[in-house]
Regions:
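Non-transmembrane, aqueous-exposed alpha-helical and coiled segments at domain scale
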Residues: 105-106, 110-137, 141-189
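Active-site-facing alpha/beta catalytic cores
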Residues: 1-111, 151-154, 162-163, 176-183, ...
Length: 191
């Protein structure tokens, strides 16, 4: 099986891809057919803006990028909006969990120099809510710089250091690191 994910960025495109269907419990649910999972980028994640409201409405799994400006309180507010509590007898509910396991992925993009200080209080605050989000690390976007020739690039050692820091944070807290988030293409990329 192949599963795809993409940033739910273009409003008109995402609206055109909305369809009603049945969820695994047979209930009518709204889905975004543009991908199996859609995610919201760091710059479009206003909690009351279109992108977050769309993600709250659909039944797809959703991801949310969080950066170094994200506070623990903001992270908790996103979790409560995007993975709200459900009744114990609700279809798809798993006893002992708030929300729906697998519904929400928080993708940290902190940068190698901030991951070890900014991420721990966010993870601790979210874990304290009882929600079981998937934690991922995007080590590319927080480590971008412009080279002397004007191209955006990344230093591989910094990318690896951010990934290592991500796993160190989760090991120290006792939370589960769900993996890394890498955008890719089969083409050469110059930004």
């Amino acid at each position: 099986d192949i599963y795809c994910s993409h940033e739910a960025l273009v409003v008109d495109y995402e609206r055109a891809m909305l369809r009603l269907g049945q969820d695994p419990a047979g209930e009518t649910a709204l889905y975004d057919l543009s991908a199996h999972e859609v995610w919201i980028g760091e710059r479009t994640r206003g909690i009351d803006d279109f992108h977050v409201n769309l993600a709250a409405l659909i039944s797809n799994p959703v991801g949310l990028k969080i950066g170094p400006s994200t506070t623990p309180e903001e992270a908790v507010a996103y979790v409560e909006k995007l993975d709200p509590d459900v009744a114990d007898d609700a279809p798809g509910h798993v006893k002992g969990y708030k929300g729906r396991p697998g519904r929400l992925t928080l993708v940290s993009r902190m940068g190698y120099d901030q991951i070890r200080t900014v991420l721990p209080p966010i993870v601790e605050a979210v874990e304290a809510t009882g929600h079981k989000v998937i934690w991922q690390c995007d080590p590319m976007h927080g480590n971008t710089f412009t080279s002397s020739n004007g191209y955006k690039t990344r230093d591989f050692d910094r990318v690896i250091d951010e990934v290592q820091g991500f796993f160190e944070v989760h090991r120290a807290i006792g939370s589960h690191p769900g993996g890394i988030h890498i955008e890719l293409t089969g083409e050469d990329v110059t930004e």
